[in-house]
């Protein structure tokens, strides 16, 4: 997935009210407010002075003319902070059949209603194969070098999704909990059970009921984001 417009570098001044970020543009020192499309805590990613990358827009319907897309760790690694992008990134990979364990499916349908007033991120289908229900979570937390974690805050909604996936597995479908690590500096994944023990318990229950788990890495640059290889899950 390529960004729609060229990203511009900036320095973060502060992130507040979850969805707002005051920044200073590198180019001219202008002070602007950007949209932060991330409802999580963004632990370790929003310190004042952090180098970030913004995507400008000229949409007259949007009050904020920049969207915060990346954190630049200034060591060659990036983190994608926009939680609306992983589904776009993964859809491209699924349609191109680049996700090995799901490459047998030719039909990819996003946002299909299921469960208790929920929508599954992707429903995959193919003649001769059981339907595959795929729920996607964006992973940005890393508290230990090289290790990604989820979640970065309490997520009752996430636990509900696991329960609904387990119901699909029990009904004879494939049900996949897919964690997309939006960091280029992580080589393993685990659950942040200390942050949300209820989610960790729901994960274990769902796995015992037949839910498959998959973690994928990403290649991230200021030009775009694409799915990389599988990352081992260590629980």
From Swiss-Prot:
Pfam families listed in its UniProt record: SfsA, SfsA_N
GO molecular function, one term: DNA binding
HAMAP family: SfsA (MF_00095)
PANTHER family recorded: SUGAR FERMENTATION STIMULATION PROTEIN A
Family according to the record: Belongs to the SfsA family.
UniProt protein name: Sugar fermentation stimulation protein homolog
